[in-house]
Amino acid sequence: MSRVAKNPVKLPAGVEVKFAGQQLSVKGAKGTLELNVHSSVEVVEEAGELRFAARNGDQQTRAMAGTTRALVNNMVQGVSQGFERKLQLVGVGYKAQAKGQVLNLALGFSHPVDYELPEGITAETPSQTDILIKGIDKQLVGQVAAEIRDFRPPEPYKGKGVRYADEVVRRKEAKKK
C-alpha cells in the first residue's frame, strides 16, 4: 500500500462526504467540491475518517490510492478552512486593485492588465502592492496565483515583478566595465 494512502483523512465537524458511484463529493461550511475517484481505488468511511486502499496490489493502483487520498485531504481542508496565496508587487508604479471578479494590475506595461478571476476564487488587495488570492480549491488557487505571477515574473537584477510572499528571488550582480 502507498505510504500516503495508509494515513486516514480525518473529517472535521461540519464536513459531509457522499458517494455516488465513482463520484465523491465533500460539503463543508465554505462550499462543495467533487472528485471522480479512479475505479481501482476503494474509499471507506468509518468513525469520522476516510480510508483509502488499492483494489489490487500493482504499483500504479497503489500510487493512485495515495494520489486520491492527497486530493481528498485537500478537498476536506478547502471546504472547512479554505486556501490562500499571497502575492507581492515589487517595482516603481506597480499597483493592484480588486474590483469584484476583476483584478486590475499596473505592471509597467503601456497598458493596464485586467485579470478575470475564475468562479470560486476571490482576490483582496490589503495594500496596492499586496494581493491575497482565496478559494476552496487548492489547485485553482495556485493556478490563479501562477497566472498572475506570469504577467511579470521577478527579474534577477533589480528584483522587480510579481512574486509569491514567501519566494526568495536570487539576485545577480550587474555587468562590470
Swiss-Prot record:
InterPro entries: Ribosomal_uL6-like, Ribosomal_uL6-like_a/b-dom_sf, Ribosomal_uL6_a/b-dom, Ribosomal_uL6_bac-type, Ribosomal_uL6_CS. One of its GO terms (cellular component) is cytosolic large ribosomal subunit. It comes from the Bacteria. GO terms for biological process: cytoplasmic translation. Keywords: Ribonucleoprotein, Ribosomal protein, RNA-binding, rRNA-binding. GO terms for molecular function: rRNA binding; structural constituent of ribosome. This protein binds to the 23S rRNA, and is important in its secondary structure. It is located near the subunit interface in the base of the L7/L12 stalk, and near the tRNA binding site of the peptidyltransferase center. Belongs to the universal ribosomal protein uL6 family. Part of the 50S ribosomal subunit. This is Large ribosomal subunit protein uL6. It comes from Pseudomonas fluorescens (strain Pf0-1). The lineage of its organism: Bacteria, Pseudomonadati, Pseudomonadota, Gammaproteobacteria, Pseudomonadales. The gene is rplF.
